[in-house]
Each structure stands twice: as C-alpha cells, then as structure tokens.
Amino acid sequence: MGGLAVAVHTTQFEIRKPEVGLFEPVLRVTKEEMDTYEARTGKTLVRVAGACGEAEQACAEARTAKALGFDAVLLSPGGLAHRTEEELVERTHAVAAEMPVIGFYLQTACGGRRLSYEYWKAVADTPGVVAIKCASFNRYQSIDLVRGVAYSARREEIALYTGNDDNIVADLLTPYRFPVDGKEVELRFVGGLLGHWSVWTHSVVKLYEELREYRDGRDIPAELLARGAAVTDFNGVFFDVAHNFAGCIPGVHEVLRRQGLMAGTWCLDPDETLSEGQAREIDRVYEMYPHLNDDAFVALNLKDWMA
C-alpha cells in the first residue's frame, strides 16, 4: 500500500501564512486527486497531512485534515525548541485526541532538536500514535528513537518510517534488535516519508520493492549498498546539503521542471531559490546516475497527466 503526505516540508510551510491561505485548499485538491486515483485503480492510498505549530494550531490543522478524510497527521516539532520534552508529549496527546498521529524526529538543520530515548518511549506509549518518522539525519539519534519504540508496550502498533534522506537504503535494510524483558525484539523501518521521493518516484518504487525482498535475512548484495551511496549523493544535490539545505525545495522543483511537470522553480518565499552551483550539480548527478532517474517514464505519461 502506498500513500501521499502533503502540507509537509516539501509542500512549503508558507502555505499556512494567513496572507497565503493555502493550507486547506492544498489538502482539498490533494484529496480530490487521491479520490480520483482510487476510483480509477481500485487501490487504496494512505493519506497523511502535515500539522505544525503549538498545540492549538496543530489540533486545528488536524481537525481540518480529518474533515477532508485524511488518515493521519505528521506532527512536526519544528519551531518548538522553547518547549520541554514533557510539553511536546502533552502536545502529542492533544493532537492524538483529534486523529491518528505520526510522530516526527526532525533534523536540527531544519528546525528540529535532539530528543531523548525517554521522549520517544513516551510518544510510542501514546494511544493514537500510529507511526513515527525518523528524519534525525543522525545514526545515534535514530537508534534512540527505535529503542524508545522497542521498549514501549505499543511497539507492535507503531510503524516506523525513515525520513533520513542521507541513509535511505541502509535504513530500509537494517534490522534493529534490542533485549526487552528477556526476549529479543526486532524492529525495522517499513517504508519512507521522504521529500526525496517526490522526484524520480517511479525509480523509487522499483528500488523499494527490491529492498523488501531482503527482509527475510538473506545476504545483502554489495551492489545495493553501492546504490544506496548513489541515492545519498543525488539526494544531497537535490536537497542542497552544500548550502545547509537552503535550496532544498527549489532543487526538487528544478528536477520536476526539467521533466516538464512544473513551469518553474518558484517558491512562496521569493528568497528561496536554487543555490549557486546547484543546477550544475544536478547536471552532474543526472550524468552520473542515468539509470536511477525516471525521465523516460514521466515522458511516456506526461501528456495524459497534464491534460
């Protein structure tokens, strides 16, 4: 089962500004498109909406998402560094009372903070938390999160999703094992919630299906690990790691523009543009990894999609 997350980072947080007013319209249009897709294909999509801000704002956004038929909210901790971990857990409880919650470990470079094992266990213990996205971009912190879930009595009720764009393939291949009450508990990331997956998506789906074949414990070929390094390389270019992610969203837009899916790279914030040299770096990864893009697939379907 696949899904779609909207009103999250790649959608641009500025949609929430009163003078922009696009939060509800974006959710509504996306809902309509997902309805159309499900009716045409008979498939079911998991519908995730982003929720941000203090508890009052996040609860209001959750109510909007619920009214539009979304399944869960991805609850961002961004901009809440002044809150204690206990206050963040209380916020999670409040939003989970509105609708199912996906917890979110956000990297510090994008407004997140270090969160403890105890915090993640408390989040996992929260009724209504159905999943957690780990985008710490840090292996130590990723283990804190997974260990917190492993030691929660609700561990079997929570799906783990990687948001670590710097470690996608390894995250999806790695079993995490912990001794809990005299027994070994194994957890894995079951999928990804990744801005990176908004581009070259057809290739992403094929890679994900291939990675799933190695969950039975068989030996992992070195070629897959090499491909993981390639994915990290071109992700770093799209997300503009060289400039501390300043051109992250324009980088995604540029890939979509080259494929004919967008008319330009504009963002709601006019100062958010491609960084110096980023377009050349996108040229480089296109040349280095032609087998990993999905340009041919997009070209084959573009006329129908844009009709």
Residue ranges and their predicted role:
Residues 233-307:
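C-terminal extensions of enzymes
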Residues 34-41, 151-158, 215, 263, ...:
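Structural alpha-beta junctions
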